[in-house]
C-alpha cells in the first residue's frame, strides 16, 4: 500500500487536520509538529492529551530502564505539551511507575492542576501509587467525566469537595484510606468469611446489606462465617435494607442475636419462609422504627403443616407507615395485612404495590377487601398501586 505523504494533506482544512491529530496518541501527534510550522500550530489546537510513561520507560524486551536524562526528558515533554495548550477537553495520565522512575507527587499534581486550569471536562487518572490528589481537583467546576484507577490510593477527601457538573464517575480498584468514618450511604455486598473486616462506620445513615453464601461447600462455609462485625458497625443507621440473601446469612451466622438499632426508623426487609424468624427479632431490636417495607411477602406466608403464621410484632411498636412490595393478591397475604393492622396502633399509611399488572376491576376488589379490614389505628389509610 502506498505510504501517505504528509505534504499531500496540506490541502485539507485546519479543522479536519485537528480532528485527525486528535485521534492519535499524544506522542504521535507531537511528532507531526516537526513537519512544518503549520503542523506545529495545528498540534497546539488539539484539545485531547494522552500522557503515558510506559512508552518512555520500558524497552520492547520488557525490562525497565531508568535514567535521569529520560526522566527529565519525559517531564519536559509533558510540560511543553501542556504549555502549548489553551483549552483542554480530555486529559489522560497513566503512570505505572510514579515513584520508581523519580516522578514526584508535586510534578504530577502540577500537571493535573494545569489541565484543570484549562477547563478540562474529562479527566482520566491511572496512577499505581499512594497519591495525594491536589485540592483544586476536588473543587473543579468543569469536570463532567472522571475516572480513577488502577491501584490509586486516595488518603483523604476534603469536606468542601464539590463537583457541580460531574455526571460520570468511574472508579476501578481504588483504595480509600480512613474514609469509612465519613461514609453516609453504603451498599455492602460480600461473602461472609471467618475473619470479618473492622470498619469505622459511625457516620452511616443508610445501609443496604447484600450478603451471599458460596453455594459450593455451603455447609462448610456457613459453619465458620462471621458477620458480627459488620452488623455491629451498622447498628446506628437510620435506614436499613436487607436483601433476602443477607437475611439468610444473618439467620445462620448470628446465633448470638442482634444488637439494638436505636436510631433505625426505616427498614426494608425481604426474606423466604425458613428465615422469617429474623424479622420479629429485628423489630424487637428496633424500638423507634416508623417505616416498615416488606418485599415478597408471599414467600413466607406459611408455617409448619402449611398453616398461616402471623409475623410477631412488638406490642410497643411505633410503626406509622407499612408498605408491601411485589404483592400477589393472595388470600394468605391478605391475612398478613389483616394481622399487622391489628398489631400496629400508630399506623397511619399502608401502601400496597402490586407485583403484576392487574385490571381495574381486580385492583378495585383488592382495595375494597383491604379497606374493610379492621385496624388498631383509627387514622390508617390504605393505598393500592400498580407495579
From Swiss-Prot:
Coiled coil: none annotated. The keyword Cytoplasm does not apply. Residues 6-60 form the F-box domain. InterPro entries: F-box-like_dom_sf, F-box_dom, FBL60-like. It holds the Pfam family F-box. Keywords: Leucine-rich repeat, Repeat. LRR repeats lie at residues 9-34, 146-173, 180-211, 219-244, 271-296. This is Putative F-box/LRR-repeat protein At3g44080. It comes from Arabidopsis thaliana (Mouse-ear cress).
Amino acid at each position: 500500500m502506498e505510504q501517505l505523504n504528509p505534504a499531500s494533506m496540506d490541502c485539507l482544512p485546519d479543522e479536519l487536520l485537528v480532528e485527525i491529530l486528535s485521534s492519535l496518541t499524544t506522542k504521535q501527534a507531537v511528532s507531526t509538529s516537526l513537519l512544518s510550522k503549520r503542523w506545529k500550530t495545528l498540534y497546539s489546537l488539539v484539545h485531547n492529551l494522552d500522557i503515558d510513561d510506559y512508552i518512555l520507560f520500558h524497552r520492547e524486551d520488557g525490562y525497565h530502564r531508568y535514567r535521569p536524562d529520560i526522566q527529565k526528558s519525559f517531564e519536559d515533554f509533558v510540560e511543553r505539551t501542556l504549555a502549548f495548550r489553551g483549552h483542554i477537553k480530555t486529559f489522560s495520565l497513566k503512570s505505572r511507575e510514579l515513584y520508581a522512575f523519580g516522578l514526584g507527587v508535586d510534578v504530577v499534581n502540577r500537571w493535573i492542576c494545569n489541565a484543570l486550569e484549562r477547563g478540562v471536562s474529562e479527566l482520566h487518572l491511572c496512577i499505581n501509587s499512594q497519591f495525594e490528589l491536589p485540592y483544586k481537583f476536588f473543587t473543579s467546576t468543569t469536570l463532567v467525566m472522571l475516572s480513577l484507577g488502577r491501584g490509586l490510593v486516595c488518603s483523604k477527601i476534603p469536606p468542601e469537595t464539590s463537583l457541580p457538573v460531574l455526571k460520570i464517575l468511574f472508579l476501578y480498584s481504588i483504595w480509600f484510606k480512613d474514609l469509612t468514618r465519613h461514609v453516609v450511604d453504603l451498599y455492602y455486598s460480600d461473602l461472609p468469611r471467618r475473619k470479618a473486616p473492622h470498619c469505622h462506620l459511625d457516620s452511616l445513615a443508610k445501609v443496604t446489606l447484600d450478603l451471599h453464601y458460596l453455594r459450593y461447600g455451603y455447609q462448610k462455609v456457613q459453619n465458620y462465617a462471621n458477620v458480627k462485625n459488620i452488623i455491629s458497625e451498622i447498628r446506628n443507621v437510620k435506614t436499613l435494607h436487607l436483601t433476602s440473601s443477607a437475611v439468610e446469612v444473618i439467620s445462620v451466622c448470628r446465633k448470638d442475636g442482634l444488637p439494638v438499632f436505636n436510631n433505625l426508623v426505616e427498614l426494608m426487609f425481604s426474606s423466604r419462609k425458613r428465615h422469617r424468624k429474623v424479622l420479629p427479632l429485628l423489630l424487637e431490636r428496633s424500638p423507634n422504627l416508623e417505616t416498615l417495607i416488606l418485599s415478597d411477602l408471599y414467600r413466607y406466608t406459611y408455617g409448619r403443616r402449611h398453616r398461616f403464621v402471623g409475623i410477631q410484632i412488638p406490642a410497643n411498636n411505633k410503626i406509622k407507615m407499612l408498605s408491601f412490595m411485589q404483592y400477589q393478591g393472595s388470600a394468605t397475604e391478605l391475612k398478613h395485612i389483616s394481622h399487622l393492622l391489628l398489631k400496629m396502633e400508630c399506623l397511619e399509611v399502608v401502601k400496597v404495590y402490586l407485583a403484576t399488572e392487574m385490571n381495574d376491576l381486580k385492583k378495585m376488589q383488592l382495595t375494597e377487601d383491604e379497606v374493610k379490614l379492621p385496624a388498631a389505628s383509627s387514622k390508617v389509610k390504605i393505598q393500592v398501586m400498580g407495579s
